[in-house]
Amino acid sequence: MKTILSSSLVVSMAAALPHYIRSSGIEASLLTDPKAVAGRTVDYIIAGGGLTGLTTAARLTENPNITVLVIESGFYESDRGPLVEDLNAYGEIFGSEVDHAYQTVELATNNLTELIRSGNGLGGSTLVNGGTWTRPHKVQVDSWETVFGNEGWNWENVAAYSLEAERARAPNAKQVAAGHYFDPSCHGTNGTVHVGPRDTGDDYTPIIDALMTTVENMGVPTKKDLGCGDPHGVSMFPNTLHEDQVRSDAAREWLLPNYQRPNLQVLTGQLVGKVLLDQNNTVPKAVGVEFGTHKANTFNVYAKHEVLLAAGSAVSPQILEHSGIGMKSVLDTVGIDTVVDLPVGLNLQDQTTVPVSSRITSAGAGQGQAAYFATFNETFGDYAPQAHALLNSKLEQWAEEAVARGGFHNATALRIQYENYRDWLVNHNVAYSELFLDTAGAVSFTIWDLIPFTRGYVHITDADPYLRLFAYDPQYFLNELDLYGQAAASQLARNLSNTDAMQTYFAGETTPGDNLAYDASLSDWAEYIKYNFRPNYHGVGTCSMMKKELGGVVDSSARVYGVDSLRVIDGSIPPTQVSSHVMTVFYAMALKISDAILADYASSQ
């Protein structure tokens, strides 16, 4: 087999390459002809050029002796213009070719389907997300080690990698006065991802200060740095953008400065269908991938060291299943021989979002975003005793119900997850919901249920990987606590919008508005929410990193159990949800796993 790339030592483009250099040269350097790599060999193949894929590719190819091929279904989109570059255009690109728009199954909650927005292009969902930069609670990350058996996956280590990825700018005096707070000890300043305050240049709205005053009267903290491991209360937050307000996406930061490395190649417009496995040894070994655009025209490329799956929490489990790695019951249904029986595609955990919006008076005009990370008790308010009663009496029942619905495979193991969540909420006051405030022309809250107890799944439904036929069922709100938690958080947002200092700027509610009486009960809210929510597009867990006996698909080095030379390195592997926007976690994951890969590479030489 021929070698695809030169391993000669050259000086790569500087990491500090100005971000405003657009695509001059890069698109011409990206491969589009599959025959350019077919039949050849590299050290590492990365299936997926999103956040984790490009971060890992950049880190591995710092060593000029390591050759890497990234295969991505989309194309280079970072210079598309305001639709990508402007965070204030969030949502406008949905429905375009840069959005996978995966469709769920018909949901049992409401007999409707939903679309899962996911970036299709180099950079993945960093092309289309809202760019919010926060970090989880320390105890959440610590539990990955203490509860799930992932040695080294604790707050101290993961936070260090997260800071390594970050190039933060402190807020200026105007931004601090508006409500930003910056703790230098919680930020990196020499990393790759540019992070700083969003600022259109307009005056900031007084509504954020009013919200802070309102919650302070409730005993809730304000103006905390949400990157320090204890997100709680109301604060403004930084975003992934440059000082000139251009989006800092993964392709712009990890590929654009490095695409001229002779040991890195990127093939676009191609799907990875399955992993090629050598089954002649006691343990199957990944030796390459099959890729293409349809089954009549496929190609193989080979990996000397490892195959790394980075196609996202919806697609990486599909690639495994098409490779014969998954639940035998699923693979038998589509006629694929089982090579390794693992609970692939289970433990899917996504959050939900509901809007509560009001008109504002002219005095409230101005820019600004903030978030209220609310604890379990703050979310439920007067309903907290009933909510605690559910936590204390229903965990076993919920686990059995989730297994019966196909969201997990072992009720005893799932109860361990639920007990971990209960510990977070009851003993550590981990944020349970997020009320995300945007003041662009309205008092617009979007409310998230951060810690879902429901479990869903993703499984292939056809043996042809290029048809991408699969069942994606997050099973939203099939757990009663999730539904009532979303209802309580939404009710809280309505109450805050017309309370205390916020009243000054309140000019009438538009959503739910007349669709839900102002004195609606929690049950009324719950019924309304079933038909008026959307997914949050933060699905995790479908190739969970945990002990095998707990339901793990990969170990603490992201290696697939029972297969040599194969890892999953993306959002499939977190075993839990977190009280945070997830980019900080995913960048840390990619860098930490990259170091594990490099250590294995060094030991092989």
Curated annotation (Swiss-Prot):
Disulfide bonds: 186-228
Gene3D superfamilies from the UniProt entry: FAD/NAD(P)-binding domain, Glucose Oxidase, domain 2, Glucose Oxidase, domain 3
GO molecular function, one term: flavin adenine dinucleotide binding
Keyword Acyltransferase: no
Chain positions carrying an annotated carbohydrate: 65, 111, 190, 280, 377, 410, 495
Signal peptide (from-to): 1-16
Protein EC: 1.1.3.4
Catalytic residues as annotated in Swiss-Prot or TrEMBL: 538 (proton acceptor)
Subcellular location, principal: secreted
Phenotype caused by lack of the gene: Completely eliminates gluconic acid formation, both in vitro and in fruit. Results in a significant reduction of decay development in nectarines and grape berries. Decreases the expression of the ochratoxin biosynthesis genes.
Subcellular location: Secreted; Secreted, Cell wall; Cytoplasm; Secreted, Extracellular space, Extracellular matrix
Catalytic activities: beta-D-glucose + O2 = D-glucono-1,5-lactone + H2O2
Protein origin, superkingdom: Eukaryota
GO cellular component, one term: extracellular region
Keyword annotations of the record: Cell wall, Cytoplasm, Disulfide bond, Extracellular matrix, FAD, Flavoprotein, Glycoprotein, Oxidoreductase, Secreted, Signal, Virulence
Record's function text: Glucose oxidase catalyzes the oxidation of beta-D-glucose to D-glucono-delta-lactone and hydrogen peroxide in the presence of molecular oxygen. Acts as a critical factor modulating pathogenicity by controlling transcription of genes important for fungal secondary metabolism and infection such as those coding for enzymes involved in degradation of the host cell wall.
Subunit structure of this chain's protein: Homodimer.
Protein family according to the UniProt entry: Belongs to the GMC oxidoreductase family.
Name of the protein in its database record: Glucose oxidase
